[in-house]
Amino acid sequence: MVKRQIPQVVQEANAFINGQGYLGVVKSLTIPKIEQETIEAKGALGGNFASGTIKPVEMEFKLSVLDKNTYLGYGLNTWNNRIPFLFKASVFQAGKGAPEPFSMAVTGDVVEIDPGSFESGKEMEVSIKLAVHFMDISIGKNQLAMFDVENMICLIGGVDYLSQVRSNLGE
């Protein structure tokens, strides 16, 4: 028998930049996509095959507030130690009881702050784009993915797919 999956709904979201919360002004969050580098096999029947490497990851989020802390994050990440970005949400799914927590911790370089256009009577939309160097995504008590570029760790579903690569390199 086929069992229908019920969609999940984000009830509310919050972002923390260098410890400061942005509850109520998080407009959107694009969760980073994890994408394989591929190589093309040519011939009578060509195809693309995974190369065992992951493309660089970027993410973007939008706030409806422009403040000193967002620009401070740009400066600290560029010329000092990277500051943490933490994204939390409450995710509801009908028939599952209580909503579950979503959590994504990210560090990386702020590559762009786009304050957008100013229009009288309109809500602001400030876009912040990050080049992600560390990411840890969980929903409920389940870690979905964690990767750490600097330490060459890629955990997906609890499996570290780069452990053998580190071992091959003597790490």
Q: Model segments located where?
A:
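A short, compositionally biased
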Residues: 6-12, 80-86, 131-132
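Eukaryotic N-proximal low-complexity acidic segments or loops
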Residues: 38-44, 82-83, 90, 123, ...
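Short, conserved charged micro-motifs
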Residues: 68-73, 139
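A generic structural micro-feature
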Residues: 51-55, 77-81, 98-100, 120-124
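Short, acidic/charged, Gly/Pro-enriched secondary-structure junctions
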Residues: 74-104
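Mixed-charge, glycine-accented linear interaction segment located at domain edges/termini
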Residues: 109-171
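Beta-strand secondary-structure signal
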Residues: 58-62, 84-88, 103-105, 127-131
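Solvent-exposed edge beta-strands and adjacent loop segments
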Residues: 1-68, 107-118, 156-170
